[in-house]
Amino acid sequence: MEINKIIEINNNNNNNNNKIIENNNDNKKIIEINNNNNDNNKIIEINDNNNNNIKDKILKKENKDSILMKPPPIFITPANKDDTITVFHQGHIISIPRKLKINLKSITDCGPDGVMFRAKNEDSKEEVIVKKISVFLMKDDKMARKLLRNLLFQRHFQQHPLVSTFQSVFKRKSSENYLISNKNNRNNVRLPLLQQKGDDDIYFEYLLPEFTLLQMIHNKLLTEYNIMIFLYQLLTVVKFMHSAGVIHRDIDPSAITIDQNQCLKLTEFYFCFPSNCPVDLFFNDYDTSSFIYRAPETIWRNTTYTTAIDVWNIGVIFGEMILGKRLFKTQDFEDHLISISKLIGNPTAEDLSIVLSKSIFQYMEKIPKSTLTPSVGIKRRFKGASKDQIELLQGMLCWDPRKRMTIDQLLAHKYFSTIHDESMQIKCNEIFNLKYYPDFYKMKSDLVKKSIENEFLTPC
């Protein structure tokens, strides 16, 4: 089979004209972000009582002649339905609609499961992110179900102001044969994944975020007030999810956006799990998620799971906001459990009483013994944290999920006394369930694809 010619694009992004202005009198830093429109540069003020220099700029300016691509046309016609082009970017070959005015720097992320672009919606005049889903993902049963699940949860939680969901969903047919090279599979083997002419490309449109929480953390842009308000917002939106009978399982700061009004939003729900589903399905696809934010009991593979999983997850993110860097840097479950023990000491016999796996129990027994207590370990790691922050960390980062503070207890803590707002603690008006998908975890990719097309495609 003939593979069409690859167009290689240069991806140098050396220019960066964002300005950082320090105002020592007001103890603020002002980041002026050039957004390719000299009349509308964005000004973001960030409180900085410590008056530290910003080590890295968050946003990289595009060239002045950059052209944001337009989203796929709303109306499909014989003239545009097959109008695509193939390009090469970061080791991946990607199909994109030919009439979209693609500029190299509009590509923001690329992987074997899809590619993301910055774009401008010509109808709303808003800057958006458009994600093209790889056909490879849609041909894998488990990956396709994960995509559908994300859409189902986004739709269910879209009423909450701290949830960011898709604006529209489009489908186009590929006009060319091309390869998608998967560099990051489990065996680290580079596999060519062929997409053929006529295969469907699915595009999702989202509002373009100002920042992600991960960017704010790693660039040390968070003030004490930022940390407090973001933690409070995160707790309230997760409480909303819990009220719908849903455990998030995979809260990641890279999937949490922040706008200029200091409003946090969750954007991804791929690993969310309804608490009313059978326990044997809980780990069906969970092994593919990162270990960095996972609670110990998810590694121990307990036969029960609770909302305390998310409390641990949020606790890790809270710790990262305080530190300005990763709390754990682990790639496998063994290393992760050792890293946890270095932070809060070894689990007690009572903590290990919930471990039912003999092999896991034996492994935990082999972890180097330590006299470190959770209190001492957390105080040692978070030397600059306040007393209230230490109390919250100790209440969230516990081996035993039964000993962790609940979301309600955390929200009622005195740490939030100056911003406490009951009106933010809303409940979902409907319990989430998969009643329309009784065999969801057995669905094949072709059926998943039909479900997405029937339920989520934007009418043309």
From Swiss-Prot:
Q: Which InterPro entries match?
A: Kinase-like_dom_sf, MAP_kinase, Prot_kinase_dom
**Which residue ranges does the record assign to the Protein kinase domain?**
102-416
Keyword tags? ATP-binding, Kinase, Nucleotide-binding, Serine/threonine-protein kinase, Transferase
* Catalytic site positions: D250 (proton acceptor)
Record EC number: 2.7.11.1
* GO CC annotation: cytoplasm; nucleus
Residues that bind ATP, according to the entry?
K131, Q154, R155, H156, F157, Q158, Q159, H160, P161, L162
Q: Which GO terms describe its molecular function?
A: ATP binding; protein serine kinase activity; protein serine/threonine kinase activity
A Gene Ontology annotation in the biological process aspect, one of them, is:
intracellular signal transduction
Known SMART domains for this protein?
A: S_TKc (SM00220)
**Which reaction(s) does its UniProt entry say it catalyses?**
L-seryl-[protein] + ATP = O-phospho-L-seryl-[protein] + ADP + H(+); L-threonyl-[protein] + ATP = O-phospho-L-threonyl-[protein] + ADP + H(+)
Under the heading SUPFAM superfamilies, the entry gives: Protein kinase-like (PK-like)
Query: Superkingdom of the source?
Result: Eukaryota
Please name the PANTHER family in this protein's record.
Answer: MITOGEN-ACTIVATED PROTEIN KINASE
Q: Which family does it belong to?
A: Belongs to the protein kinase superfamily. CMGC Ser/Thr protein kinase family. MAP kinase subfamily.
Q: What name does the UniProt record give this protein?
A: Probable serine/threonine-protein kinase kinase DDB_G0280557
Q: What taxonomic classification does the UniProt entry list for its organism?
A: Eukaryota, Amoebozoa, Evosea, Eumycetozoa, Dictyostelia
